Amino acid sequence: LGLAYGNWLAGIQNMGFKWRGQIGENSGGLDLRYVGLSDLELRSNKPTSKPLGYYSAYGISARGITSREIGAIKFGLALQLIELEIYQESSRGVAFDFGATWSINEYFKFNISALNFGRMNKLESSAPELPKRLVNSVSFDQKSSSLFIGIESNSLLNDMIYYVGGNSKYKNLFFGGTATSTKGMKSISGGVGFLLGIYTITYGFQWGDHHLGRPQM
């Protein structure tokens, strides 16, 4: 069970809820997420000291997850319901995720996933395009540490995205980081966490080269 809250540039807020558990022979989960603004100003074409009003823009998603392990391969499937709203316009849609992990041996794993394959209803005159993603990665796990490299194809970008990162754990402390690179963009993200019995406290950051600030969660 997990709860998260974050804030970023211009008052953007995000909140998340996660649950993981066992459902019969399968593993299951539920993810809820909200990202939004609540103080956008509506103004006319003429300069005024006060706005005509205020409105919000937000996105909400609810995702159900199930997974099952067959031999050395673990399969996962997710169904996601999405709602977007800005001013007086809204759009709803559905997306599917699929993933598989093959344990090559005791240390190496090969991962493949297809994310955000679905569609949205029209938002005013056109439907929002979901960022369809195909991600492949190889990870190396040893005791309390893990390293990985990955490559991603994204329908909204012409160039591939490359990842390299890792994480480690020492007693009740765990930490990790990831470097991401594609044409015109590079970023570094990381975080630390502390286990307190059944509770976990985490702090994360992401730093990019678009100078949009440093989001924290």
Description of each model-found segment:
Residues 1-217:
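Subset of outer-membrane beta-barrel
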